[in-house]
Amino acid sequence: MPKMKTHSGAKKRFSVTGSGKVRRLKAYKSHILTKMSGKKKRDLRRPTIVETNGEAKRIKRLLVA
């Protein structure tokens, strides 16, 4: 059986931290940002951790194929 390929879309969107958690970037940062406060825009810059264990497990399966 051939090797499994890493999911191209997932590898562009997610990364796994050293402790094994899944890191992702936040949405709503592309356009029409004038109505958004500076604090909100700053908060959107920082990556966050995928909290749901089921989702994180599925993403890891796509990445570590």
UniProtKB/Swiss-Prot annotation:
Region: Disordered; residue ranges are 1-20
Tree of life domain: Bacteria
Q: Which UniProt keywords apply?
A: Ribonucleoprotein, Ribosomal protein
Record's compositionally biased regions (Basic residues) = 1-14
This entry carries the following GO cellular component terms, namely: cytosolic large ribosomal subunit
Q: Which GO terms describe its biological process?
A: translation
Query: What Gene3D superfamilies does this protein's entry cite?
Result: 4.10.410.60
Pfam families assigned to the protein according to its UniProt record, in alphabetical order: Ribosomal_L35p (PF01632)
Provide a Gene Ontology MF annotation, just one. structural constituent of ribosome
Q: Which residue ranges run through the membrane?
A: none
Q: Does the keyword Transport apply?
A: no
Extract the InterPro entries matched here. Answer: Ribosomal_bL35, Ribosomal_bL35-like, Ribosomal_bL35_CS, Ribosomal_bL35_sf
- Record's family? Belongs to the bacterial ribosomal protein bL35 family.
Protein known as:
Large ribosomal subunit protein bL35
Gene symbol of the encoding locus: rpmI
